């Protein structure tokens, strides 16, 4: 038995999911914690309720549905494309509202026409909310991590810095801190003077030998930790990242991109103009962006209600492209949110790459909005 009452519109919502070709899937409330800790992002990791089995396995109360639905799909070895629907309780530590609440949504797995699948996810989220909140105008905020990644990859940064920036996408405070760091070279702090001297001289063999001796003297086993060679490689990367500086023109370029915010109907032209003026090629990322807008138009979605913000992301690490959120016009509470997560199923154990997109509905917030 659930500890809180299911929303009174749950039955109608499940019927709507079925009409949209999404089959309901149930997943256990108790989940293995590792996938969420590894892939869900720092914001969600802080909110997870963790526990442990008698055998020492790390477990958690289900904090969201995307990872459990994907694990269920892999476990049952069903074919694709497949549309799944879910409705149930999730558990998160929250500053406002209860720690236990209902979410529902659709996960679209294996649809090769990614632009069409993206558009369908946005259209479904809007359509469902219009049914649940008739006559209430909605706004949509849209971002695209693939476009951001394409811009970052043109800057000539080391791969470690590229990863840092991409992982910070959507977290404006963290991203701004990284850009400030890139504006002026830093020094690597906390290094042993001997290690620092060997790194500065470029004597890799000497560094490995020094680390090997240190590990032997302190009793560290290479079987239980990284080898001296692996540690040396990480230290070299740490030093390179600390000393990396992004020149003023490139930094200005990145900040200019992140400042873009405009109606979605104008976004393709704005991105193409930005790329041309900067001498960049955004390639497949821009092509996919344009194809998604065309697919939205084909579905009759009102593009004037959608805003593209280049810096907009969602606080989950598994997103790879489209990200979006839907709210009532003039309000900040997110009623629906989702995006594309093409790498997630492979990371969870799928044998082949499975393109995927989906969205979740915050039923407690929708219930409050219906009551007003």
Curated annotation (Swiss-Prot):
This protein's pathway: Amino-acid biosynthesis; L-histidine biosynthesis; L-histidine from 5-phospho-alpha-D-ribose 1-diphosphate: step 1/9
GO molecular function annotation: histidine-tRNA ligase activity
Disulfide bonds listed in the record: none
Source organism, top-level taxon: Bacteria
Tagged with keyword Cytoplasm: yes
Location of this chain's protein in the cell: Cytoplasm
Descriptive protein name: ATP phosphoribosyltransferase regulatory subunit
Species name: Allorhizobium ampelinum (strain ATCC BAA-846 / DSM 112012 / S4) (Agrobacterium vitis (strain S4))
Species lineage: Bacteria, Pseudomonadati, Pseudomonadota, Alphaproteobacteria, Hyphomicrobiales
Gene: hisZ
């Amino acid at each position: 038995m659930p500890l809180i009452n299911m929303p009174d519109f749950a039955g109608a919502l499940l019927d709507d999911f079925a009409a949209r070709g999404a089959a309901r899937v149930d997943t256990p409330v108790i989940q293995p914690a590792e996938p969420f800790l590894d892939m869900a992002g720092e914001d969600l990791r802080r909110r997870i309720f963790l526990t442990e089995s008698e055998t020492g396995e790390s477990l958690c109360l289900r904090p969201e549905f995307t990872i459990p639905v994907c694990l269920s799909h892999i476990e049952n070895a069903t074919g694709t494309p497949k549309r799944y629907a879910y409705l149930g309780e999730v558990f998160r530590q929250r500053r406002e509202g209860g720690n236990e609440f209902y979410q529902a949504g659709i996960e679209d797995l294996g649809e090769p026409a990614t632009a069409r699948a993206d558009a369908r996810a946005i259209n479904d989220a809007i359509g469902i909310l219009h049914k649940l909140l008739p006559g209430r105008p909605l706004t949509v905020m849209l971002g695209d991590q693939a476009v951001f990644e394409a811009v970052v990859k043109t800057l000539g940064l080391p791969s470690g810095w590229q990863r840092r920036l991409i992982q910070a996408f959507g977290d404006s405070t963290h991203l701004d801190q990284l850009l400030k760091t890139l504006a002026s070279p830093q020094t690597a702090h906390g290094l042993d003077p001997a290690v620092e001297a060997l790194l500065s001289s470029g004597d890799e063999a000497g560094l490995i030998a020094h680390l090997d001796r240190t590990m032997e003297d302190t009793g560290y086993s290479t079987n239980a930790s990284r080898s001296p060679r692996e540690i040396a490689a990480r230290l070299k990367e740490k030093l390179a990242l600390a000393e990396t500086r992004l020149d003023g023109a490139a930094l200005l370029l990145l900040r200019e991109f992140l400042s873009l915010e405009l109606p979605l109907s104008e976004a393709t032209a704005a991105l193409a103009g930005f790329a041309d003026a900067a001498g960049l090629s955004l390639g497949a990322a821009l092509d996919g962006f344009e194809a998604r807008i065309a697919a939205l138009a084909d579905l009759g979605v009102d593009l004037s209600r959608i805003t593209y913000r280049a810096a907009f992301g969602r606080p989950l690490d598994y997103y790879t492209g489209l990200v979006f959120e839907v709210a009532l016009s003039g309000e900040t509470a997110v009623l629906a949110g989702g995006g594309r997560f093409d790498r997630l199923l492979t990371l969870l154990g799928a044998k082949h790459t499975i393109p995927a997109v989906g969205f979740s509905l915050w039923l407690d917030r929708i219930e409050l909005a219906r009551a007003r």
